[in-house]
A protein has these predicted regions:
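Hydrophobic beta-strand residues in large extracellular and virion-surface proteins
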Residues: 5-7, 19, 25, 38-41
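Short aromatic-glycine-(Arg/Gly/Cys) micro-motifs in beta-strand/loop hairpins
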Residues: 1-14, 42
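Intrinsic disorder/low-complexity signal
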Residues: 10, 22-25, 44, 55
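Short, mixed-charge low-complexity intrinsically disordered segments
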Residues: 32-58
Length: 58
């Protein structure tokens, strides 16, 4: 199982950051709460056949 942090910035750029554990995903997502450049951050659980949204910050 992989985890993805999808970050949507004010300038329209979308970046994906992948992590091997939920703890790493959650740790990095906390920084998004304090950034003024980020519109939304979405935490995803990425499986072989299914992607599940875990949380949204924004």
């Amino acid at each position: 199982m992989k985890y993805c942090l999808k970050i949507i910035k004010k300038d329209g750029n979308v970046t994906n950051h992948y992590f091997s554990s939920y703890e790493d995903l959650e740790y990095n997502a906390t920084y998004c709460q304090f950034s003024t450049n980020i519109i939304k951050a979405i935490g995803l659980e990425v499986g072989l056949f299914k992607t599940k949204t875990l949380f949204e910050i924004g």
